[in-house]
Amino acid sequence: RIRNGALEEISPKLVTMMIGTNNLHEDKKAYPPDRPENIFAGIRAIVNEARTRLPKSRIVVFSIFPRKAGPAYERVKAVNALLPQLADGKRVFHVDINSLFLSDKGLLNKSLFDRDLLHLNKQGYLTWATAMKPLLKKHGLRVNPNALGQKD
């Protein structure tokens, strides 16, 4: 999509990305999951394409959100360990807020996810949005004080 015009005629101040999670899906009957280094290579390619097509934009890459314990979560952690390499501190930044989605014991906080334990539910999205408010301010963007129904 990016190469086919999805970013034409726009110039956002900030682009946020949380990508790669769908590449971790495993359907043993159809196909194996992508390897972490291949997922990272895909994320890097998308970030580089966005840098080229949006030369005035800053890009924030979020770590892939945690999963329930198991092989997929091990792959999430492997990809996330590579993501800081993308940050240059000028235009591309890496942000890891995964601790917000974990319990005190380091397990997935199921109350923030839908039944599939992959997609965030309303409370999970509110958690993410709340974490984004200081990030937006840090990058010089104004935040609606009534956003999320909360006052600053």
Predicted regions and their residues:
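Charged helix-capping and loop-helix junction motifs
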Residues: 33-44, 75-80
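N-terminal cationic-hydrophobic initiation segments that often serve targeting/anchoring roles
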Residues: 6, 47, 51, 84-87
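Catalytic His-Asp segment of secreted/periplasmic serine-dependent ester chemistry enzymes
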Residues: 66-152
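Oxyanion-hole/transition-state-stabilizing segment in secreted/luminal serine hydrolases
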Residues: 1-40, 60, 64-68
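Amphipathic, non-transmembrane alpha-helical secondary structure
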Residues: 2-4, 37-44, 48, 126, ...
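Loop/turn elements at helix/coil->beta-strand transitions in domains of secreted/extracellular proteins
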Residues: 10-15, 54-58, 89-93
